[in-house]
Amino acid sequence: MDKIIVITSNIAPYRKEWCEELAKFYDVTIVYTKDHDYERDDRWLQKESKTCRILKLKNDKDRFDALCFDVIDVIRDNKDALIVFDGYGPKTNLLGLLYCRLKGRFSLVNVDGYPTERKKSFLKETVKRFVIGKLCTGFTASGEATKEHLLSYGAKEDRIIVHNFSSIREKQIAGRPYSREEKLEIRKKLGIQSEKQIVLGVGRFLPLKRFEDLIDAVLMCKTAPDLYLLGGKPEASYLKHAGDSDRIHFIDFVLPEQVDDYYRAADLFVLPSETDVWGLVLNEAMAQGLPLIASDSVVGARSLIRENGKIFRTYDVKELSEDIDLCLEKDNHQKMSAESLDIVRDFTIENMVRRQKPFIDAYFEREKRK
């Protein structure tokens, strides 16, 4: 069986799922550099797999930017394997990319998206152009917007696979939108007493997520929905913006397998980030039939939001509030819910691998002919 080595910083649940789908067709080893992530709960990370081998590189500091020199040993000892780097930013990945380039060895870089930065450093842009245009030899890209971004930095179009990035499997997609009665029943299970329409936000409570904008927008809405923010202990700024309102609710960390019930209980999902390289929570919300609203700084919104929601200008609280009211209007809501389910069926882990497999198989065929 042909071998693939995936080199990543840590093993996110969706990364493991993707590797395990690849493992149906290839011999896959996941090589990672750190056991912890200061921005995430350790319970979220994955360290075991039934179908992939897992190898930890030496990293005494357990940092994202640590330089693990033994990545060279892994690449050198697996001469027949296709090397796949999860991103081009980590130092260990850059070292591995440089080694592959010096040895004339093809590798793939998986690119989930890109930061939508408003201020750009000349030095950083120059280095990025060199890495993408000269150092990397092939890419798997999360969507068309990511592909265009890579092309703008010098990547070759015939070396890019667009795979419709996702964290969900086909079996996780609801067969139809949930009814009002079903949502109320799920709310009881979660201990939610509200019978109002619910707007949901999911993600780490970080400044760049702009959840304070969502709080302000919900409090301005004519439809007066409740807001549930799921992702940790609320920031002081969130509590200040919420004031004494009984419509704003904060939920601490929830395991991935429990989050779906919150999607099912809600009526609308909003991601107001000031930058987001993709936004996998959009995929997850769509899989449960939710309409979406996201800022124009969320890269995934450009692929996922069509007639199933709205994209608003980042930081524009008034526009966000108006969009929430529009999406919660009964006729719009029903149409958008059905549209979300139609769109997301093309964004699954199975489809990611289906799109990647012809490119990967062609690579191994070329190598065998040498």
What are the residue ranges of the model-derived segments?
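Donor nucleotide-sugar binding/catalytic pocket of nucleotide-sugar-dependent glycosyltransferases
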Residues: 136-184
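Conserved acidic donor-binding segment of nucleotide-sugar-dependent glycosyltransferases
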Residues: 306-317, 325-331
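Short alpha-helical donor nucleotide-sugar binding micro-motif in glycosyltransferases
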Residues: 253-254, 261-266
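Nucleotide-activated donor-binding/catalytic signature segment of Leloir-type glycosyltransferases, i.e.
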Residues: 237-254
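Conserved donor-binding/catalytic core segment of Leloir-type glycosyltransferases
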Residues: 193-209, 215-218
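Aromatic "clamp/platform" in nucleotide-sugar-dependent glycosyltransferases that forms part
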Residues: 274
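Short hydrophobic beta-strand element within catalytic cores of glycosyltransferases
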Residues: 291-295
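A short, histidine- and acid-enriched strand-loop-helix "catalytic/donor-clamping" loop
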Residues: 105-123, 135-138, 169
